[in-house]
């Protein structure tokens, strides 16, 4: 399911002394079934942008089109329910979207809200509680008794349980150990492979280079680049200018290049780095 922004502005507290420009003239299109990363330093407008995907925020100017439904400044709350069934948001702080008495009830809430039967909602909830790596022992606990990492998993399960066409994630791996982070990102990547669109906000360029196939870069509420991660990360000077880190893999590869190692193309993932080095060494060995 595709998303298109056309000349979107967003203004916080318009007409008051606290008026602030959140987004300025944002235009882009996200392909259906893609894995898109949104990057930018703190305060660049990433979370503001994401909240436009399901109408939590309405554009002050311009339009957002999702599944042939247009969202503008005049869109009513009633007309947003169909869009919100198709777009799931996982916020940066999971406690902000947990509220039920038990984990099971919390994860069931989304499916029930969007028309699932009680039995189907329970089946979906149990399935996704397991998928995100939680044991059934937590199902009858209050979500607020859990650790931060467990709460994040519950929040993710609660959105994925109604299987939205578009999944939006704001720093979803924060608070998880490396194994937990990989487990979550493998779930998100598999969800994309099943035909869904996944949108990720992250400060972690390694995650972006590993999983995303498209990338939006924001700065002070402006979209300054829309390209593949390969293109964005190909220019370390541009990254430095805009206060973005380079993925650890390509940073290491550039050090190897300074030592005389030549890459056919700059690797962005550990697998591509290892494959490139292995191929070069085998080729060199065969020529000796």
UniProtKB/Swiss-Prot annotation:
- One CC-aspect GO term: ATP-binding cassette (ABC) transporter complex
Gene3D superfamilies given in the database record: P-loop containing nucleotide triphosphate hydrolases (3.40.50.300)
SUPFAM superfamilies this protein is in?
P-loop containing nucleoside triphosphate hydrolases
Residues forming the ABC transporter domain are 3-245
GO MF annotation, one? ATP binding
State if Membrane is listed as a keyword.
Answer: yes
**InterPro entries annotated for this entry?**
AAA+_ATPase, ABC_transporter-like_ATP-bd, ABC_transporter-like_CS, ABC_transpr_CbiO/EcfA_su, ECF_ABC_transporter_ATP-bd, EcfA2, P-loop_NTPase
The compartments listed are: Cell membrane
Q: Which UniProt keywords apply?
A: ATP-binding, Cell membrane, Membrane, Nucleotide-binding, Translocase, Transport
For the keyword Translocase, the answer is yes
| Membrane association type | Peripheral membrane protein
The UniProt record lists the EC number as 7.-.-.-
- Which EC class does it fall in? translocase
Q: Which domain of life is it from?
A: Bacteria
Q: Which residues are recorded as binding ATP?
A: 40-47
Complexes and interactors: Forms a stable energy-coupling factor (ECF) transporter complex composed of 2 membrane-embedded substrate-binding proteins (S component), 2 ATP-binding proteins (A component) and 2 transmembrane proteins (T component).
Quote the function comment for this protein.
ATP-binding (A) component of a common energy-coupling factor (ECF) ABC-transporter complex. Unlike classic ABC transporters this ECF transporter provides the energy necessary to transport a number of different substrates.
Similarity annotation: Belongs to the ABC transporter superfamily. Energy-coupling factor EcfA family.
This protein's name: Energy-coupling factor transporter ATP-binding protein EcfA2
Highest lineage ranks of the organism? Bacteria, Bacillati, Bacillota, Bacilli, Lactobacillales
